[in-house]
Curated annotation (Swiss-Prot):
Binds 1 zinc ion per subunit. Keywords: Aminoacyl-tRNA synthetase, ATP-binding, Cytoplasm, Ligase, Metal-binding, Nucleotide-binding, Protein biosynthesis, RNA-binding, tRNA-binding, Zinc. This is Alanine--tRNA ligase. It comes from Haemophilus influenzae (strain ATCC 51907 / DSM 11121 / KW20 / Rd). It is found in: Cytoplasm. Zn(2+) binds at residues 563, 567, 665, 669. It is an enzyme of class 6 (ligase). Its EC number is 6.1.1.7.
């Protein structure tokens, strides 16, 4: 019986024997594709090839692509672990033809791999196929050439409500490449319920789709017209877990070798004995998606990809809690995962320390609120009468206790209760603090400038070139000429201008002739051409005309210093903080550099000083900045670091600075590190959960920054009648003095508050025999109000006190209740009622509670509401 690892390798070996290039799985974070949250299919990394925007040195490829499909807007995730084939993470085996072979070979390859005794050797009589209803070519290949009997070939038409909307017709989008597909199904046998595709029983588990072969032969236009593609292509996908289940003679993916091992290890760690428990399946699935997402650079956070990761981790933690886990357990599965994934586990192994650390930190963070949140949910569920949990409760769990909605849905599912998701959505919309992941992703590929050909870049060695204009764009439209005063995009045949990429800003400068001046404000890349964005200030320009292209050399030079310093900073961070540090974003301009990186913990001042010192040491070492062009595999073998989110071709540019830094980079750099002169960090802070940002300056900008700091220090010392050397000591003396005065003032306020107590006791009103004081006292801080309330409780013996005070444009509320009344009157309940009137919230003990608010105009109303509520409840 083949293991999953052996099946993966045999697939790649088979297609390699058929002339396919074996291509590594791409990252789960799609490169240069804002339309996708995660890589979810094998074709994602080849999307630009299919669109004609990218060229590869091969026309046949095969991959074992890791994919993540975490579910839809809310609670699709709750099904993972409860069905036989629903996963957050899976591997997609695929073979691809880019204008090479088409239907005949694609179908023959699939059949040979599945049925040949040399490969998988599946019984031919167990295989069924579907084709698009009008795809006679595919039908005839299956029937006449391959020999599949007609009764096992099913034509599927438009079954989704509109033309070409079918299970057997695939499209990349509303427009663009599309075409029919043929799917191969495996019949598990009549001991399992279900019918063949297209039948009323097709949702059963007997007939399972194992391979989808897409024939991209049309280009769909905006009006729905289908044009034949000049070079049709093939895109296929076969789920590794599904074919493993077939070959290992099991009906559920969770029974294949990978999952059996992960489930057994989970049970061992948490002390579970029932290996059929659904929670074990959930955890075994989730460790795969979570570990690989972190290895590919995703950090748990409250938005976008990071929030999807957080949802999955928290669901796994909750299921561990159900199994009886008493301590952090999830991260302990990583070594087992690496082992069972075999060759495909190498990316997680390379980041193992960071993966385990982030999983443990996230689990520990959630554990602090898990118990309280579950207690609140349990109480709310016990009061449900109509089988529906209110959206308000679900939102409170989300907002206060960090419960993703699908986690709450998981708990509800176990009690046959649903959630009022519409009410939840209304609360989310009102809050507007956490964006839905899907709202952050989406781009219309047809809206960008599209030009055939490519621009030859000469900027590595030149800052001035003669160049011919190949296209002009005015107001987003292609034009033949532009006139003075018009802003436009100029496309050149060759250029010294660097187009923005890799974090480095685009060059500026000008294009000119004797009678023409076009000021270039920015340079951007559109496919393979460079667009020079700016304004024509003199003369006219037309397509075909030659111009002098002249880069702003000083701006370029300063930018190059900052770019080289960014590489030194990256290497220094990894040396001092650890190899888990990976770039998450950067901006390199002529003024400064900004570098975002993965780092789960705050950086100490000492570490920051070490980092800065190390970078400056490497600057003084005056390493040559060496550039080499090589293939991607050689670069990786040399130890070159590929950056998160960047897209590389087969030939890459490797930038080396001594033995300290080696990275893939297409940017402009200094000739030697000594050219940078000086490196100074000016800010360091967190920009998101697990992501830190450093901003720094170099060269003359660093010197100017230090001069400005010195000027500020000198002015500050003069104001305090001190000198720079004793300034810190002088400030400390002033702070100590201020604290002493503040303490004395607070004592006087508290004394005055206690003396005022007798007045309030006399002004107390009786409600059903209970003394009540409800007053507005402006200008008094919360601490003094609390002292006053405590004193009044002692003086009254029995009573309720509610104070509101306006101070520094804020409302402070304090409520006190004597112990004999807390069974009837809760201070927290009353203070929250008052807080609602002033746009705030608060809480506390039954006998003492505080709140704040911002709506000063409603303070009188808050006091009145308190009086009315006490009249009603006493």
């Amino acid at each position: 019986m083949k293991t999953t690892a052996e099946i993966r390798q045999s697939f790649l070996d088979f297609f390699h024997s058929k002339g396919h290039q074996v291509v590594e799985s791409s990252s789960l974070v799609p490169e240069n594709d804002p339309t996708l949250l995660f890589t979810n299919a094998g074709m994602n990394q080849f999307k630009d090839v299919f669109l004609g925007m990218d060229k590869r040195p091969y026309s046949r490829a095969t991959t074992a692509q890791r994919c993540v499909r975490p579910g839809g807007k809310h609670n699709d995730l709750e099904n993972v672990g409860y069905t036989a084939r629903h996963h957050t993470f899976f591997e997609m085996l695929g073979n691809f033809s880019f204008g090479d072979y088409f239907k005949q070979d694609a179908i023959n390859f699939a059949w040979e791999y599945l049925t040949s005794p040399q490969w998988l050797g599946l019984p031919k009589e167990k295989l069924w196929v579907t084709v698009y209803e009008t795809d006679d070519e595919a039908y005839n290949i299956w029937n006449k050439d391959v020999g599949v009997p007609a009764e096992r070939i099913i034509r599927i038409g438009d079954n989704k409500g509109s033309p070409y909307a079918s299970d057997n017709f695939w499209a990349m989008g509303d427009t663009g490449p599309c075409g029919p597909c043929t799917e191969i199904f495996y019949d598990h046998g009549d001991h399992i319920w279900g019918g063949p595709p297209g039948s009323p029983e097709e949702d059963g588990d007997r007939y399972i789709e194992i391979w989808n072969v897409v024939f991209m032969q049309f280009n769909r236009l905006a009006d729905g017209t289908m044009e034949k593609l000049p070079r049709p292509s093939v895109d296929t996908g076969m789920g590794l877990e599904r074919i493993s289940a077939v070959l290992q003679h099991v009906n559920s993916n969770y029974e294949i070798d990978i999952f059996k091992t992960l489930i057994a290890k989970t049970a061992e760690i948490v002390g579970a004995t029932d290996l059929t428990n659904k929670s074990l399946r959930v955890i075994a699935d989730h460790i795969r998606s979570c570990a690989y997402l972190i290895a590919d650079g995703v950090i748990p956070s409250n938005e976008g990809r990071g929030y999807v990761l957080r949802r999955i981790i928290r669901r796994a933690v909750r299921h561990g809690h159900l199994l009886g886990a008493k301590e952090s357990f999830f991260y302990k599965l990583v070594p087992t995962l690496i082992d069972v994934m075999a060759e495909a586990g190498k990316d997680v192994k390379a980041k193992q320390t960071n993966v385990e650390k982030l999983l443990r930190l996230e689990e520990e963070q959630f554990a602090r609120t898990l118990e309280r949140g579950l207690s609140l949910l349990d109480e709310a569920l016990s009061q449900v009468k109509d089988g529906i949990l209110s959206g308000e409760v679900a939102f409170k769990l989300y907002d206060t206790y960090g419960f993703p909605l699908d986690l709450t849905a998981d708990v509800c599912r176990e009690r046959n209760i649903t959630i009022d998701e519409q009410a939840f959505d209304r609360k989310m919309e009102a809050q507007r603090t956490r964006a839905q992941a899907a709202s952050q992703f989406g781009v219309d590929y047809n809206s960008v400038i599209r030009v055939d050909g490519e621009t030859k870049f000469e900027g590595y060695t030149e800052v001035e070139s003669q160049a011919k204009i190949t296209a002009l764009f005015y107001d987003g439209k292609s034009v033949e000429s532009i006139e003075a005063g018009q802003s436009a995009v100029v496309i050149l045949e060759n250029t010294p201008f660097y187009a923005e990429s890799g974090g480095q800003i685009g060059d500026s400068g000008y294009l000119s002739t004797q009678s023409v001046t076009f000021n270039v404000k920015d340079t951007q890349k559109y496919g393979q051409v460079f667009g020079h964005i700016g304004e024509l200030t003199q003369g006219s320009l037309k397509v075909g005309q030659s111009v002098n292209a002249i880069v702003d050399a000083k701006r370029r030079h300063n930018t190059s210093l900052n770019h080289s310093a960014t590489h030194l900073l990256h290497a220094a961070l990894r040396q001092i903080l650890g190899l888990h540090v990976v770039q998450k974003g950067s901006l390199v301009s002529d003024k400064a550099l900004r570098f975002d990186f993965a780092q789960p913990e705050a950086i100490t001042k000492e570490q920051l000083s070490e980092i800065e010192t190390l970078v400056n040491q490497k600057i003084r070492a005056n390493f040559p900045v060496q550039t080499d062009i090589m293939d991607i595999d050689s670069a990786k073998a040399k130890g070159a670091m590929a950056l998160f989110g960047e897209k590389y071709g087969d030939k890459v540019r490797v930038l080396t600075m001594g033995d300290f830094s080696i990275e893939l980079c297409g940017g402009i750099h200094a000739k030697r590190t000594g050219d940078i002169g000086l490196f100074k960090i000016i800010t360091e802070n967190a920009v998101a959960a697990g992501i830190r940002r450093i901003e720094a300056v170099t060269g003359q900008n660093a010197i100017d920054w230090l001069h400005n700091q010195q000027r500020i220090l000198t002015q500050s010392a003069d104001l305090l009648k001190s000198d720079v050397n004793t300034l810190a000591e002088k400030i400390q003396q002033l702070q100590d003095k201020a604290k002493k005065v503040e303490k004395e003032l607070q004592g006087l306020k508290e004394k005055a508050a206690m003396q005022a107590g007798s007045y309030f006791v006399k002004s107390a009103v009786k409600i059903n025999g209970v003394s009540v004081i409800a007053q507005q006292l402006d200008g008094i801080e919360t601490k003094s109000l609390r002292v006053m309330v405590d004193d009044l409780k002692n003086q009254l013996g029995s009573g309720v006190i509610a104070f509101a005070s306006i101070l520094d444009e804020k409302v402070n509320l304090v409520v006190g209740v004597t112990n004999d009344l807390t069974a009837k009157i809760k201070a927290g309940e009353l203070v929250n009622l008052m807080a609602q009137q002033v746009g705030g919230k608060g809480g506390g003990r039954p006998d003492m509670a505080m709140a704040g608010g911002s709506q000063l105009e409603n303070v009188t109303q808050a006091i009145k509401v308190a009086q009315d509520w006490l009249n009603k409840n006493l």
